[in-house]
Amino acid sequence: MDSLQNHLLIAMPSLKDTFFERSVIYLCEHNEQGAMGLMINRPIGVDVNELLRQMELDDFHTIESINSKVLVGGPVGQEKGFVLHTPQPQWSNSQQISDDLMLTTSRDVLTSLGSKEAPEQFIVALGYAGWGRHQLEQELADNTWLSIPANIDLMFNTDHESRWQKATESLGFDIWQLSSQAGHA
């Protein structure tokens, strides 16, 4: 099995699941046991500053950035927060995903946002998308998703609403011309 960790999943236009329709998911982990990722294009209507106020973090700095919106990371564990960010070594509960990205689940990264200790680029998400053993592989075989290597520019410098379109454009072909049926001529 080839791991798709550090790849983006792009929902096929035929995916009519209201939660995942036109979603782009960054895969943080993919192994024999399953997969875990964060949707990177669904703001929840709360910005990071408001989230930090709700968490009663007194020591935060106001954040002004394209990624200042909190995102729905997925349907699982929506009470749990994740910060996907460029590497910074000082936080607890950080996992290095690639040379360019880390995932942190501790509060200390949140208090750094907006300060000089903050990661250069970040996404804050609540919840995650999860797949059991071989579930993602089956969904890929069923043409539910397409995958591409992670694209830092798309993830951090493209507005949320345009990320699905930009991801599909990066494929190099018109996604609307693909069949949703696998293996049929």
Swiss-Prot record:
InterPro entries attached to this UniProt entry: AlgH-like
Source organism superkingdom: Bacteria
Coiled-coil segments: none
Gene3D superfamilies associated with the record: VC0467-like
One GO CC annotation: cytosol
NCBIfam families in the record: PRK00228.1-1 (NF001266)
Assigned protein family: Belongs to the UPF0301 (AlgH) family.
Protein name (record): UPF0301 protein Shew_1144
